Amino acid sequence: MGQNFSKKSSNDLVSRIIFTIFMLIICRIGSFIPIPGIDSIALNSVAEKNQFGILGMFNMLSGGSLGRMSIFALAIMPYITASIIIQLMSVAYKPLENLKKEGESGKRKINQLSRYLTVLLASFQAYGVALSLESMVTNTGPVVILAGFFFRVTTVITLVVGTMLLMWLGEQITQRGIGNGTSLIIFIGIISGVPSAIISMFELSRKGALSPLIAITVCIGVVLLIAIIIFFEKAQRKLLVQYPKRQVGNKIYGGEATHMPLKLNTSGVIPPIFASSILLFPTTLANFSNSNSETMSMLSYYLGHGKPVYILLYVVLIMFFSFFYTAIVFNSEETANNLRKYGAYIPGKRPGKNTSDYFDYILTRLTVIGGLYLSIICVIPELLMNKYVISLSLGGTSFLIVVNVVLDTMTQIQTYLFSSKYEGLMKKIKLKN
């Protein structure tokens, strides 16, 4: 009986992995279906010129869909942005904060609000893309075959539907597959661009544009970067939590101590992604006017990768969102109240406000280190790419996302296997009894 249960659990895990792979294949197929009314030759010419610009990272996150102007050109970024905005608003806006406390029903309502906001943001971005495409002209002719109202409407509908389809695929992976669907969609997009980035680097080395020593140094640097990211992502500060002793009859229960782990990088990869979104926003607004305007030229120059203004704003925004998102993920006051409710306490700290202040003190120190770690990981590759013209697929943000997704997915698989073995063990015990 135990063997049958173990076999059933193993088959369930395999089916979940197969389902996840199938959904990701659909995402990749969609990234090669172009939106209607585009001259592919002219578009390729434009994409080659802008592969190292500020739009390069978003092309990387979309798995090349933005460069090919496919139905998934906006990727799942509008949904991520909408979710983050709703989370930020839930801190400042009381009705949303109350919804979070309503449990499963409140969670469903918040998810629905995120979807509505996704449609709004995707529509805004899609219209900006349509206007940008209409303004693009190359030596072979305009990118848009027949510009006008019909093209704009078609583009907006196509891109919004593509984003909503990706959102749905991500939700299906989360519910019926393995790992976080949204993260895996971004992950597969980044991974798809790695082979071409490696080929491009070795091609530059072969032609003499990049010395073999630098190419080898980059490869060693990549391995070290991955090791550093794994170290910092796994780093924790463990706080001792003591539970009081309780006497029930002649027996004494409790009194044991446990540890509360606080991650060094509590905010995850959200700060660099959202910081990049903020830096892209002025450029998106400029596209509504004229792409050849002085404003657009200034924005393109000052917000170019590796430029001092871009680097400074990038670091400031990463630090800001590190603190802001950590405050959302970990509520010190709520955690302190929960500990007091169960009679637990931090040794040397009084329950309640004293404990809450202690959490804030620890988190502030951790977040400073975590924010600096994120800034260094994201900024150093930016400077190197600007100097040696290496593809954005090898950027710091992409490494952060890939390593985090792999670690999270592996943890979920291990948790699933452990819970399956635990359930099998419990069934065996019940059968013996």
Curated annotation (Swiss-Prot):
It is a multi-pass membrane protein. InterPro entries: SecY, SecY/SEC61-alpha, SecY_CS, SecY_dom_sf. It is found in: Cell inner membrane. GO terms for cellular component: plasma membrane. The chain crosses the membrane at residues 17-37, 71-91, 117-137, 141-161, 184-204, 212-232, 268-288, 310-330, 366-386, 388-408. The keyword Plastid does not apply. Its main location: membrane. GO terms for biological process: intracellular protein transmembrane transport; protein targeting; protein transport by the Sec complex. Gene3D superfamilies: SecY subunit domain. Keywords: Cell inner membrane, Cell membrane, Membrane, Protein transport, Translocation, Transmembrane, Transmembrane helix, Transport. The central subunit of the protein translocation channel SecYEG. Consists of two halves formed by TMs 1-5 and 6-10. These two domains form a lateral gate at the front which open onto the bilayer between TMs 2 and 7, and are clamped together by SecE at the back. The channel is closed by both a pore ring composed of hydrophobic SecY resides and a short helix (helix 2A) on the extracellular side of the membrane which forms a plug. The plug probably moves laterally to allow the channel to open. The ring and the pore may move independently. Belongs to the SecY/SEC61-alpha family. Component of the Sec protein translocase complex. Heterotrimer consisting of SecY, SecE and SecG subunits. The heterotrimers can form oligomers, although 1 heterotrimer is thought to be able to translocate proteins. Interacts with the ribosome. Interacts with SecDF, and other proteins may be involved. Interacts with SecA. This is Protein translocase subunit SecY. It comes from Rickettsia typhi (strain ATCC VR-144 / Wilmington). The gene is secY.
